[in-house]
Amino acid sequence: MAKQKRKVPEVTEKKNKKLKKASAEGPLLGPEAAPSGEGAGSKGEAVLRPGLDAEPELSPEEQRVLERKLKKERKKEERQRLREAGLVAQHPPARRSGAELALDYLCRWAQKHKNWRFQKTRQTWLLLHMYDSDKVPDEHFSTLLAYLEGLQGRARELTVQKAEALMRELDEEGSDPPLPGRAQRIRQVLQLLS
């Protein structure tokens, strides 16, 4: 059987018109829910103005959409006021790259810091990039080899399998490997883990 297309009832068009009308008339949120947050309920709940009730025709989803739009408008107005006052919004500090975080993780492991703890994402990054001398410099590679000695389980098995596959690939290329440093790193990892 062929599926029949569902006709959009006129009721939704009426709801959309009412939603536009409600947003044009003004916010449903009273001055109690101003950005200062003095009169707002706990956890930022919206407080309706006493004179205006939400229209019963608006579904909960439509109300959420309307509230999101109003919140966005309030934030925009707040930024505009700050800009006019000459204050610049503070930008969050730049996030550190994955390389920096992973190498910092490795250094903390080597120094046996109390705040060091296993982090799978950092270990995964190190295992993926350990053959690249640009991403894991030579001064950190010896530390990485010491870290790999303690590698356990599936991570150890996969690292050995990948190293063997890379070695086979280098052997097939011939006697002149394009990256001798990479080949040396692969050999060191294989000798350590095999």
UniProtKB/Swiss-Prot annotation:
Q: Which UniProt keywords apply?
A: Phosphoprotein, Secreted
Q: Where is the composition biased (Basic and acidic residues)?
A: 61-83
Classification via InterPro entries: WKF
Q: Which PANTHER family match?
A: CHROMOSOME 7 OPEN READING FRAME 50
Q: Which Pfam families match?
A: WKF
Expression induction per the record is: Expression is induced by feeding and cholesterol absorption.
A single GO BP annotation from the record? negative regulation of cholesterol biosynthetic process
Q: Which residues carry this modification: Phosphoserine?
A: S23, S59, S97, S175
Expression (tissue specificity): Secreted from the instestine, secretion is induced by feeding and cholesterol absorption.
Region described as Disordered: spans on this chain = 1-83
Query: Which GO cellular component term is one of those annotated?
Result: extracellular space
Q: Name one GO molecular function term.
A: hormone activity
Q: What is this protein called?
A: Protein cholesin
Describe the task this protein carries out: Hormone secreted from the intestine in response to cholesterol, where it acts to inhibit cholesterol synthesis in the liver and VLDL secretion,leading to a reduction in circulating cholesterol levels. Acts through binding to its receptor, GPR146.
